[in-house]
């Protein structure tokens, strides 16, 4: 399971004595699914959840509950469909413990964040000739203080649904 494999990874980092200097960022999939369907041979409740013999569907009611307080579900571009929690751990790099940040991040921010941690300026990241500038912003400032990662906009598009988020 995911918990066991993450545990193995953390144990190995600790054994290598690099855990405290390692930035770990973990995020979930976006939004709960409102699907109500049967796939393949259907759903066998006697089998372990997540196995090939199961297909658990929440349906719109429980999906709304799972995404609460946000609206809608996976596929939709409302916050319930696109919002994803991120947990960051870096014992020697993040002084805050157990605090919540409300900055809007995006997966395109991961590379600039890791380069920032490694001391590589964004301008020094090699790009293919003619490539557009590297998107994303470092999330490192948010590790110290909420409200420090600013962006003009983020655009979402998925299965015919689209949105432009400006500010908060």
PLM regions with names:
Residues 52-79, 93-103, 107-168:
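C-terminal cap/loop subdomain of S1 sulfatases and analogous C-terminal strand-loop tails that border
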Residues 8-11, 116:
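A generic structural signal for well-ordered alpha-helical segments enriched in polar/charged residues
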């Amino acid at each position: 399971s995911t918990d066991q494999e993450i545990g193995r990874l953390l144990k190995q980092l600790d054994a290598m004595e690099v855990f405290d200097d390692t930035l770990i960022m973990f995020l979930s999939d976006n939004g709960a699914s409102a699907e109500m369907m049967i796939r393949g041979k259907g759903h066998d409740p006697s089998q372990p959840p997540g196995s090939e013999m199961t297909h658990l569907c929440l349906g719109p009611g429980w999906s709304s509950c799972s995404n609460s307080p946000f609206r809608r579900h996976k596929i939709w571009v409302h916050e319930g469909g696109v919002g994803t929690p991120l947990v960051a751990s870096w014992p020697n790099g993040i002084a805050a413990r157990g605090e919540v940040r409300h900055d809007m991040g995006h997966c395109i921010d991961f590379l600039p964040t890791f380069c920032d941690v490694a001391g590589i300026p964004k301008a020094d990241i090699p790009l293919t000739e003619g490539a557009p500038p590297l998107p994303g912003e470092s999330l490192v400032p948010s590790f110290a203080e909420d409200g420090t990662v600013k962006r003009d906009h983020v655009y979402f598009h998925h299965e015919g649904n689209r949105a432009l988020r400006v500010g908060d």
